[in-house]
Design a protein with these regions (language model features):
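Transmembrane helix-loop-helix hairpins at the membrane interface
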Residues: 91-203
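Juxtamembrane helix-loop-helix connectors linking adjacent transmembrane helices
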Residues: 20-111, 118-129, 133, 200-203
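Short, Lys/Arg-rich, polar N-terminal cytosolic tail immediately upstream
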Residues: 2-31
Length: 203
């Protein structure tokens, strides 16, 4: 088989690949490439005391209204299961784990890119710049990681950047990180409701 016949065409989100080994077609690849990268960034940011202070402050509404957030979370989970059933998506333990992963990645990405990095950027080498530039840079990195770890197309990464800016704006207005995480979870599910399982995923 020659190189051209072995190549994989682009999917809805992912770029084409001349080498099938580079194409992300398994849940495990998403978990290792993207989940691990974003987790390391998020947990690394939480080593800074200034981030921990901001984190606990941003969760005040969650701690004060934990029952409400629990109900909203359960409602979102039920909606996701109903969505999968209505659109004839496969519903099994693997899919449930995927939904859980989407919640996890929403948590670590919001802690890392909406909360932590703008603070760290503006508190360190960007002191002479506006805090908004820290938000811009953080979301630029956020979109860039999707380009490299998930092999997303440039157009999808641009929308990811704009979506990140929107979430940053919502976080700036509400100062409620739990709310932003739930919004992120819902949007991410609608964008990628099922885990990759073959080379035709997302096409």
């Amino acid at each position: 088989m020659n190189k051209s016949s072995a190549s994989i065409s682009e999917g809805r989100l992912q770029r084409a690949s001349q080498n099938p080994a580079n194409y992300i077609s398994k849940f495990r690849q998403v978990l290792l490439r993207h989940g691990t990268t974003m987790s390391l960034i998020s947990f690394g940011c939480m080593l800074f005391p200034i981030v921990l202070v901001a984190l606990f402050s941003s969760l005040d509404n969650l701690f004060s209204n934990i029952n409400r957030y629990a109900l909203v979370s359960l409602g979102l989970g039920f909606f996701m299961l109903l969505y999968l059933r209505l659109f004839s998506k496969e519903l099994n333990y693997r899919q449930i784990f995927w939904i859980g992963y989407l919640l996890f990645i929403s948590i670590v990405e919001e802690i890392g890119f909406r909360l932590s990095l703008p603070i760290l950027f503006s508190d360190s080498f960007l002191k002479e710049y506006n805090f908004l530039f820290g938000i811009f840079l953080s979301n630029l990195l956020f979109a860039s990681f999707h380009y490299f770890t998930l092999r997303w197309k440039l157009k999808a990464c641009i929308f990811t950047f704009l979506g990140g800016i929107g979430l940053s704006r919502l976080f700036y207005v509400t100062e409620d990180l739990a709310l932003i995480i739930l919004v992120h979870w819902a949007i991410t599910f609608l964008n990628t409701p099922t885990a990759p399982n073959n080379i035709s995923t997302e096409k």
